[in-house]
Amino acid sequence: MTTPIRFELIKTCRQTGARLGILHTPHGSFETPMFMPVGTLATVKTLSPEELKEMGAGVILSNTYHLWLRPGHDIVAEAGGLHAFMNWDRGILTDSGGFQVFSLSEFRRIEEEGVYFRNHLNGDKLFLSPEKATEIQNALGADIIMAFDECPPYPATYDYMKRSVERTSRWAERCLKAHRRSNEQGLFGIVQGGEYEDLRRQSARDLVSLDFPGYAVGGLSVGEPKDVMNRVLEFTTPLLPTDKPRYLMGVGSPDSLIDGAIRGIDMFDCVLPTRIGRNGTVMTSEGRVVIKNAQYARDFTPLDPNCDCYTCRNYTRAYIRHLIKCDETFGIRLTSYHNVYFLIKLMEQVRQAIREDRLADFREEFFERYGFNKPNAKNF
């Protein structure tokens, strides 16, 4: 299969097995492991494309379900596709909309042909199938598009998960058949199976036989404990081809990025940095800071003294706290900028540690500084 997406493996860390690579796309080549900021509605909330480039973002994520509802994939196509519509000339990945259908809609009915559900905005009845999800993504024009999968809840029974995995495999085949722009867009398959090793094995075998240009590990970061996620990754990533990129969906806390890379993951995405930024929480080299707390009212130091981002070079904790407390948009911009920058730079450090065969040492140092080694450590 000819594909516009190619993965080049540069080096494997001797200490951990983590992979240093390059993801080649129609809109540039980007080093992995990488963190992909999420721009659900064709914008990373409060941040401009120029700012994202300034930070070193390579691929960003947009959401098929939301863009289908607003403004409509036909309008995006008319604009020349997502790249032209949002003025972003680097990589874009769109998810299939499956997760939103399963998480946002209170009413949904899963049939073999697809999913019937209600629009979360106005209650209208809608239907999304593998063919429709692929058609929408073809119109949106991202570099990487995702197969439409069923996203089971956690926990799910073995029998339910087995049926779900089999359906996801059949849907993946239908997505491939419906894909009309395979010379311009790489379609990735999504491995499901919950925490059941034999079902992950079955799902991976089914999808690898279809020869996708890349594979995602789905169904994680849905409420399971971190040790369960790590265990699932340990038995799932070895089932995937070494010459294809591996994408862990919906994961963005610093500890999970490092632990995912150690387990052979190349790509990550999450709304976490902008979502917690809007609530006044920031990630720093010394751990997380809840900037709304009273202790920062007279703190005239940067959010993170070890960070050289725009926010930390120019503004103090006291000022940012004032903005957030007053619901000023600029405060949200400053915390969001810093958090996205923090994760992009963290992945640069991870890549450097892989080059130097010292990722396990880096993990230990980072966890100690950040506070992940403490009892009752916070997730981010």
Curated annotation (Swiss-Prot):
GO BP terms, alphabetized: queuosine biosynthetic process; tRNA wobble guanine modification; tRNA-guanine transglycosylation
Q: Where is this region: RNA binding?
A: 250-256, 274-278
The residues that the entry says bind Zn(2+) are C307, C309, C312, H338
Query: Pathway membership of this protein?
Result: tRNA modification; tRNA-queuosine biosynthesis
Q: Which Gene3D superfamilies match?
A: Queuine tRNA-ribosyltransferase-like
Annotated substrate binding lies at D95, S96, G97, G98, F99, D149, Q192, G219
Cofactor (UniProt):
Zn(2+)
MF GO annotations: metal ion binding; tRNA-guanosine(34) queuine transglycosylase activity
Query: Catalytic site residues?
Result: D95, D269
Per UniProt, what is one Pfam family of this protein? Answer: TGT
| Reactions catalysed, as given in the entry | 7-aminomethyl-7-carbaguanine + guanosine(34) in tRNA = 7-aminomethyl-7-carbaguanosine(34) in tRNA + guanine
Q: What's the superkingdom here?
A: Bacteria
Q: Which SUPFAM superfamilies match?
A: tRNA-guanine transglycosylase
What does the note accompanying the cofactor annotation read? Binds 1 zinc ion per subunit.
Which InterPro entries does this one have?
A: ArchSynthase1/Queuine_TRR (IPR050076), TGT (IPR004803), TGT-like_sf (IPR036511), tRNA_ribo_trans-like (IPR002616)
Q: What is its EC number?
A: 2.4.2.29
Instruction: Give UniProt keywords alphabetically.
Output: Glycosyltransferase, Metal-binding, Queuosine biosynthesis, Transferase, tRNA processing, Zinc
Q: Which GO CC annotations does the UniProt entry carry?
A: cytosol
Recorded family membership: Belongs to the queuine tRNA-ribosyltransferase family.
The free-text function statement in the UniProt record for this protein reads: Catalyzes the base-exchange of a guanine (G) residue with the queuine precursor 7-aminomethyl-7-deazaguanine (PreQ1) at position 34 (anticodon wobble position) in tRNAs with GU(N) anticodons (tRNA-Asp, -Asn, -His and -Tyr). Catalysis occurs through a double-displacement mechanism. The nucleophile active site attacks the C1' of nucleotide 34 to detach the guanine base from the RNA, forming a covalent enzyme-RNA intermediate. The proton acceptor active site deprotonates the incoming PreQ1, allowing a nucleophilic attack on the C1' of the ribose to form the product.
Subunit architecture: Homodimer. Within each dimer, one monomer is responsible for RNA recognition and catalysis, while the other monomer binds to the replacement base PreQ1.
Known PANTHER family for this protein?
Answer: QUEUINE TRNA-RIBOSYLTRANSFERASE
Name of the molecule in the record: Queuine tRNA-ribosyltransferase
- Source organism (scientific name): Geobacillus thermodenitrificans (strain NG80-2)
Q: What is the lineage of its organism?
A: Bacteria, Bacillati, Bacillota, Bacilli, Bacillales
